[in-house]
């Protein structure tokens, strides 16, 4: 009889405690903040993406090409090699010594905003620390040697550049666009400090018919 009573007993129903509105808001806020932190870590220490603006890198890169930028080398302090395509923060001016100038950004919040809003240029590394760069007419010489570049499609026309002769100081690079006649680069704003290099452009993922390495 006792066994029959046990069989007929209904299982105990556990009540699930309903989350409060405050708890739900906190969980959503936490998830969003975590996603932002992860995105920032990836962008600043691993990889980022950029969209090519303008025609300064023709014919290598076209306007609206989308690129993957490798941040690891810059984070580890490895200087890029001559010929690398890199992204650099757009300078605001140049000094009398031919060094690109930038405004100082102070405060954690301001630096965070700046990391998302700063303008980037896509350029090719031409000169490394210690190199003597000389531009005369349509000729580019590095350490006295005439450079032959198969990635440009027309000769450089002479313009009265602000900087046509310079020895690249330590910790800096001299950059130029492949479209030499339509590029704002180190000929105008000077050599770029290493810390203003965003990273190396290693991959093009748009458009799909140009999908692949650079």
Q: Which stretches of residues belong to each language-model region?
A:
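Hydrophobic membrane-insertion alpha-helices, especially the h-region
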Residues: 29-45
């Amino acid at each position: 009889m006792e066994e029959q009573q046990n069989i007929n007993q209904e299982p105990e129903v556990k009540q699930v405690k309903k989350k409060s509105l405050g708890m739900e808001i906190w969980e959503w806020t936490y998830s969003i903040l975590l996603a932002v932190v992860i995105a920032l870590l990836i962008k600043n220490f691993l990889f980022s993406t950029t969209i090519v603006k303008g025609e300064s890198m023709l014919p290598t890169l076209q306007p609206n090409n989308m690129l993957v930028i490798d941040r690891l080398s810059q984070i580890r302090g490895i200087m890029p090699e001559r010929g690398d395509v890199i992204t650099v923060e757009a300078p605001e001016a140049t000094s009398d010594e031919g060094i690109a100038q930038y405004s100082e950004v102070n405060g954690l919040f301001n630096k965070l905003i700046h990391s998302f809003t700063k303008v980037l240029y896509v350029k090719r590394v031409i000169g490394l620390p210690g190199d003597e760069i000389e531009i005369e007419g349509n000729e580019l010489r590095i350490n006295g040697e005439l450079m032959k570049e198969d990635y440009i499609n027309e000769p450089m026309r002479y313009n009265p550049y602000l900087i046509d002769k310079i020895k690249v100081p330590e910790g800096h690079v001299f950059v130029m666009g492949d479209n030499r006649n339509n590029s704002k680069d180190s000929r105008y704003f000077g050599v770029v400090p290493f810390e203003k290099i965003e990273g190396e452009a290693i991959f093009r993922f748009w458009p799909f018919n140009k999908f692949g390495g650079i």
